[in-house]
């Protein structure tokens, strides 16, 4: 399955991530997944949200540079070696992974 991901560029300073997530929270946008990569001067926050259009709009209106891309979602069995089985398929097909989200979900959908 493919979903849209938003990449947001942030200054690498205390509180900047809090400010960005406040914009999303104030607009009732729920993050489903998050990944953060940082360098000395800036960070790239990659998020998957419940409302991509509204999220990109409110982020842009708040002054955040963001980019929308498609990512592949793979559900893995929750067993030892589950991830390895999928990675073998990628390796055999010469598919390179740039980054990945990892999420272990409980049966309850209302818990993060």
Please describe what each predicted stretch is.
Residues 1-80, 84-112:
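Structural preference for solvent-exposed beta-strand-turn elements
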């Amino acid at each position: 399955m493919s979903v849209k991901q938003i990449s947001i560029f942030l200054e690498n300073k205390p509180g900047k991530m809090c400010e960005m997530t406040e914009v999303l929270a104030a607009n009732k946008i729920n993050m489903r997944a998050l990944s953060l990569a940082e360098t000395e001067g800036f960070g790239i926050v990659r998020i998957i949200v419940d409302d991509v259009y509204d999220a990109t709009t409110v982020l842009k209106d708040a002054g955040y540079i963001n980019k929308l891309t498609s990512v592949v979602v793979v559900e893995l069995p929750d067993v030892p070696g589950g991830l390895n089985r999928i990675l073998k398929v990628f390796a055999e097909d010469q598919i390179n992974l740039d980054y990945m989200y990892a999420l272990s979900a409980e049966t309850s959908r209302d818990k993060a």
